[in-house]
Regions:
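Domain-level signal for Mg2+-assisted phosphodiester chemistry and nucleotide/NA-binding surfaces
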Residues: 1-67
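Nuclease catalytic cores that cleave nucleic-acid phosphodiester bonds
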Residues: 40-123
């Protein structure tokens, strides 16, 4: 099955700029199931336990994720490794990430990868 795999960085980027990464994905790729890893939830929970702007963004992200109909993969490995492995094993999947290092790594392996822009577009 093909998925749109969404990374923590894109979720937080969307919140920071009042853009809904899930809506953008749905509009551009309605035929693909959205997928995140348990590790994304763990990263957000860890961030949310702190104070400051990033913690507030993480809390907002968690509230949003709890109301979305997303598939959550229960593997608890490091998120970037999970994304690379999952995208490699599922043909025609693509990844949404605003993490520059991960973006370049995925692209170098031939995996379709997009970033969420400040305007809410996937590029």
């Amino acid at each position: 099955m093909a998925y749109v795999i969404i990374d923590t960085s894109s979720i937080l980027f969307g919140i920071r700029y009042n853009k809904d990464v899930f809506k953008s994905v749905n509009e551009k790729y309605p035929q693909l199931k959205q997928l995140i890893s348990y590790g994304v939830m763990s990263e957000l929970e860890k961030m949310a336990s702190n104070k400051g702007t990033k913690a507030n963004e993480a809390r907002t992200a968690l509230k949003i994720l709890r109301h979305k109909n997303l598939k959550v993969d229960n593997k608890s490995e490091y998120v970037d490794s999970w994304i690379l492995d999952t995208a490699s094993k599922n043909a025609n999947s693509l990844v949404i990430t605003n993490d520059t290092k991960l973006f370049k790594n995925l692209k170098s392996k031939g995996i379709e990868t997009k970033k969420l822009s400040k305007s809410g577009e996937l590029r």
